[in-house]
């Protein structure tokens, strides 16, 4: 048995970061590879959604941790990621996985130490979601769940594009919302530095660990 873990929305300005984990046997890994499971960023949304159902019904189990903007604004993002990884591994531990594969983000040492401390072999590498099917499967789970969550937010707050700071639609929406509303919406990450220029009164520094 192998565990694969990946995230979606780490760098987003809007919405949660979704961290997903799957546990799967080697035999089923071959099946998923054969049907085209790969890094979610290389797939269209339609293809991701089709593969989501197949992945969910093929893996032994999957689990998801949502990390919301207010958490990201008050704690170190890497620490939140490590905490999510720990929760996922513990929730899948009953399957006795041999190894845990995680996409490397930043310094891999804390993740390796965490996995080893929990009693498992670690495989923490850059582009794990491209190189290892178990991580690719987790990336599809994470991305589809985040996409659907973002769709729900748009029903309430309007179309803000992808929710990433590099998206002009997202910035246009933020500026428009800022002009009309003195209070920030709970869906944005107020500690993102782009707010300094686009919505300065919404911006908070992580240093103060201020809550909403």
From Swiss-Prot:
A divalent metal cation binds at residues 6-7, 103. Its EC number is 3.1.26.4. It comes from the Archaea. Gene3D superfamilies: Ribonuclease H-like superfamily/Ribonuclease H, Ribonuclease hii. Domain 2. GO terms for molecular function: manganese ion binding; RNA binding; RNA-DNA hybrid ribonuclease activity. InterPro entries: RNase_H2_suA, RNase_HII/HIII, RNase_HII/HIII_dom, RNase_HII_arc, RNase_HII_hlx-loop-hlx_cap_dom, RNaseH-like_sf, RNaseH_sf. Keywords: Cytoplasm, Endonuclease, Hydrolase, Manganese, Metal-binding, Nuclease. Manganese or magnesium. Binds 1 divalent metal ion per monomer in the absence of substrate. May bind a second metal ion after substrate binding. One of its GO terms (biological process) is mismatch repair. Its main location: cytoplasm. Residues 1-204 form the RNase H type-2 domain. Its cofactor is Mn(2+); Mg(2+). Pfam families: RNase_HII. GO terms for cellular component: cytoplasm; ribonuclease H2 complex. It is an enzyme of class 3 (hydrolase). It is found in: Cytoplasm. It catalyses: Endonucleolytic cleavage to 5'-phosphomonoester. NCBIfam families: ribonuclease HII. HAMAP family: RNase_HII_A. Belongs to the RNase HII family. Endonuclease that specifically degrades the RNA of RNA-DNA hybrids. This is Ribonuclease HII. It comes from Saccharolobus solfataricus (strain ATCC 35092 / DSM 1617 / JCM 11322 / P2). The lineage of its organism: Archaea, Thermoproteota, Thermoprotei, Sulfolobales, Sulfolobaceae.
């Amino acid at each position: 048995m192998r565990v694969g873990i990946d995230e979606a929305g780490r760098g987003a300005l809007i919405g949660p970061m979704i961290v997903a984990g799957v546990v799967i046997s080697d035999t089923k890994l071959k099946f998923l590879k054969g049907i085209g499971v790969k890094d979610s960023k290389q797939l269209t949304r339609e293809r991701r959604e089709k593969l989501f159902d197949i992945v969910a019904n093929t893996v032994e189990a999957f689990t998801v941790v949502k990390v919301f903007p207010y958490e990201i604004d008050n704690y170190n993002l890497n620490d939140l990621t490590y905490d999510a990884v720990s929760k996922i591994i513990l929730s899948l531990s009953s399957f006795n996985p041999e190894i845990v594969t995680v996409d490397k983000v930043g310094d891999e040492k804390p993740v390796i130490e965490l996995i080893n401390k929990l009693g498992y072999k670690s495989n923490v590498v850059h582009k794990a979601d491209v190189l290892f099917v178990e991580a690719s499967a987790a990336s599809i789970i994470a991305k589809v769940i985040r996409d659907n969550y973002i769709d729900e937010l748009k029903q309430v707050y309007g179309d803000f594009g992808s929710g990433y700071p590099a998206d002009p639609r997202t910035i246009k929406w933020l500026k428009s919302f800022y002009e009309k509303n003195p209070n920030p919406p709970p869906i944005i990450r107020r500690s993102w530095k782009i707010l300094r220029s686009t919505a300065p009164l919404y911006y908070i520094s992580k240093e103060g660990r201020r809550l909403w």
